[in-house]
């Protein structure tokens, strides 16, 4: 989209390189390859593997893991199938910036040798990680190759997931870049529209059942809403983080189903209870469809998405009533904080001089915010105090996730800055509040927009520690109002 995407979606209007870099280790294997050729490994049961060849290798993630644990699927078969789909898709939609083709196959072989295979929650599940999140041995965007895995990657591997590579993300994950050899990621539902992020596009296109995403001002939820997948941003410190951006973004999950997202989040948070998504007890739910400012207009189909979610919740037995969220100046405060944190963290980068001129200009603005103390903790304290009072009456609040359909898939950042900033404010005014206070929020698909031919969605948000409640309510929505797992 534009520089604006940094404001509303932590750079979610993503761009990718013209061709993903494929890394190849020295080791060779006779296990399944990305060409689709496979050799049955010792100890496999060929007849059972054939029984599983009916699409189980494409997900959902929980099905893949169960089949791998039970010996119905070889994880190499799953990785090979995913690699084939990615290779075909990246000929026209460059979603992956780094595809770890041979490494993924080698890791799949190693997975079969693990003594704990039968208890791994994500055994053999292919996953994508957002660019900028270190994978050991892979180049960092702004410095040398990473020497260790980010905690997110380490936990995914420990749970048996196979990390296929990095999906593309803008510089510093902060804004759209679509110049030169880069191009905007297109929406799998309507290629004329933006996808919101490469991670969401990868999930919606069926390349992977689960992807990691970073959410600084709504990126995971904005992109999930654009692409019709489920996305959740956990509360602050639920998932560990390290490095320059620790504290300014949360590591979230995008998936084709709530079950899969809950499974992945339970792994990232080291909380097995989050994978349990039985219906919640009777909840008090507020429906808040008004935008943070009367100057902002909300597309009626996005308002209808929130109202539909509220109706489904009421039919499920929850107490639902109209409500007014106490936004105050939260969106503006979130923007100022985002600028200040970005400028604060840049010196920690290994090679900050590699940043683009445009990024350096924006970081200079962040330093000005710091210098004049325009972003300070008291702003957050005031907003949080009002929200705590609001949530004395409610367990969950429902809003539209976005206020408009995804923007057109073009190089928005070439447009003049006021135009892009205005577009950003119009797109996603509902998401930044929850980043400012560090509370959990999720985006739940709720149908299609009749004019843009892209999905619409509702946002569910709750107080600190309500991740399980949001997941359970979202799963209940999915059961009563199911959505198509991937784009046609």
How should each PLM-predicted stretch be described?
Residues 2, 11-14, 36:
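Intrinsically disordered, low-complexity segments enriched in small polar residues
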Residues 21-24, 28, 32-33, 37-39:
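Periodic, rod-like helical contexts
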Residues 36-115, 267-428, 436, 465, ...:
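Amidase signature
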Residues 69, 79, 88, 154, ...:
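Structural helix-boundary/capping segments
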Residues 121-249, 288, 401-419:
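Short glycine/serine-rich loop/turn segments
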């Amino acid at each position: 989209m534009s520089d604006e995407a940094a404001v509303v979606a932590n750079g979610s209007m993503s761009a990718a390189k013209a061709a993903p870099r494929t890394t190849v280790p020295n080791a060779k294997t006779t296990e399944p390859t990305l060409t689709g050729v496979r050799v049955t490994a010792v100890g496999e049961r060929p007849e059972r593997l054939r029984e599983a060849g009916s699409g189980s290798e494409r997900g959902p993630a929980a099905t893949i893991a169960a089949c791998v644990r039970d010996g119905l699927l070889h994880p190499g078969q799953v990785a090979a199938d995913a690699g084939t789909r990615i290779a075909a898709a990246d000929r026209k939609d460059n979603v992956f910036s780094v595809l770890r083709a041979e490494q993924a196959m080698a890791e799949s072989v190693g997975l079969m040798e693990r003594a704990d295979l039968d208890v791994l929650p994500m055994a053999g599940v292919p996953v994508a990680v957002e660019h900028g999140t270190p994978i050991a041995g892979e180049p960092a965007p702004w410095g040398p190759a990473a020497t260790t895995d980010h905690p997110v990657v380490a936990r995914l591997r420990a749970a048996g997931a196979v990390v296929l590579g990095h999906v593309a993300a803008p510089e510093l994950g902060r804004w759209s870049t679509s110049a030169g050899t880069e191009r905007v990621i297109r929406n799998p539902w309507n290629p004329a529209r933006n996808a919101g992020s490469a991670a969401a596009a990868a999930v919606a296109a069926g390349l992977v059942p689960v992807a990691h995403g970073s959410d600084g001002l709504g990126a995971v939820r904005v992109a999930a809403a654009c692409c019709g997948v489920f996305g959740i941003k956990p509360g602050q410190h639920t998932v560990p983080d390290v490095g320059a951006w620790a504290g300014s973004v949360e590591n979230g999950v995008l998936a084709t189903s709530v079950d899969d997202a809950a499974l992945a989040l339970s792994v990232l948070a080291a909380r097995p209870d989050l994978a349990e998504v039985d219906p919640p007890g009777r909840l008090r739910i507020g429906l808040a469809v008004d935008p943070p400012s009367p100057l902002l207009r909300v597309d009626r189909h996005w308002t209808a998405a929130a109202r539909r979610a509220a109706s489904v919740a009421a039919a499920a037995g929850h107490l639902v009533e109209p409500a007014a969220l106490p936004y105050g100046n939260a969106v503006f405060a979130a923007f100022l904080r985002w600028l200040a944190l970005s400028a604060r963290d840049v010196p920690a980068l290994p090679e900050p001089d590699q940043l683009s001129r445009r990024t350096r200009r924006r970081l200079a603005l962040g330093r000005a915010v710091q210098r004049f103390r325009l972003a300070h903790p008291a702003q957050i304290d005031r907003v949080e105090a009002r929200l705590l009072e609001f949530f004395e009456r409610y367990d969950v609040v429902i809003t539209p996730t976005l206020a408009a359909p995804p923007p057109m898939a073009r190089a928005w950042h070439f447009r003049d800055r006021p135009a892009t900033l205005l577009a950003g404010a119009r797109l996603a005014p509902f998401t930044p509040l929850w980043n400012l206070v560090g509370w959990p929020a999720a985006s739940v698909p709720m149908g299609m927009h009749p004019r843009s031919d892209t999905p619409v969605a509702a946002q569910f948000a709750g107080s600190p520690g309500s991740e399980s409640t949001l997941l359970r309510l979202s799963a209940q929505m999915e059961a009563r109002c199911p959505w198509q797992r991937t784009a046609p």
